[in-house]
């Protein structure tokens, strides 16, 4: 299942090509801040976080923080926190397994257990965005569902 939430007046990015009805209630594992600029989710001891596209560090993003800000930095090393490209999608694999896509063209801040190892926090510059929660049987199912709702990449990779 894919659930869509909208906050404020989202900027239309055309990243999501399928229509979904808006849902009012977030899943129990997500807690939204009063100003709608951030949300948190508790992490289990063994939870792994995948995603954010071509970013720094290893496969498991847990324990670090990242900024989605599309910087054009020729020397993109592991000590950088700002992502080279904006892929605001990640999957939590653990006690709760789900994917989250933040459809927002401005800065998005991801704290994946950096400040508090047991909590992931996602923040946006302003409360004008769409949030998609993707639930499925497993990580691959969640990724497949997400790929079906986003626009085709302008680059076509050959097998």
Predicted regions and their residues:
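Conserved small/polar residues in nucleotide/adenosyl-binding loops
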Residues: 155-159
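Catalytic and substrate-binding clefts that recognize carbohydrates or anionic sugar/phosphate headgroups
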Residues: 1-154
């Amino acid at each position: 299942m894919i659930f869509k939430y909208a906050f404020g007046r989202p900027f239309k990015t055309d990243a999501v090509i399928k229509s979904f009805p808006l849902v009012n209630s977030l899943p129990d594992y997500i807690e939204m801040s009063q100003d709608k600029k951030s949300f948190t989710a508790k992490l289990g001891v063994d939870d792994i976080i995948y995603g954010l596209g071509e970013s720094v560090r290893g496969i498991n993003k847990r324990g670090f923080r990242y900024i989605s800000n599309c910087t054009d930095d020729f020397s993109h090393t592991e000590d950088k926190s700002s992502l080279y490209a904006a892929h605001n999608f990640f999957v939590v694999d653990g006690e709760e397994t789900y994917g989250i896509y933040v459809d927002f063209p401005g800065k998005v801040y991801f704290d994946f257990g950096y400040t508090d190892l047991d909590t992931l926090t996602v923040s946006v510059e302003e409360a004008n965005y769409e949030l998609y929660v993707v639930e499925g049987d497993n990580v691959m199912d969640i990724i497949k569902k997400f790929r079906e709702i986003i626009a085709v990449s302008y680059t076509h990779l050959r097998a």
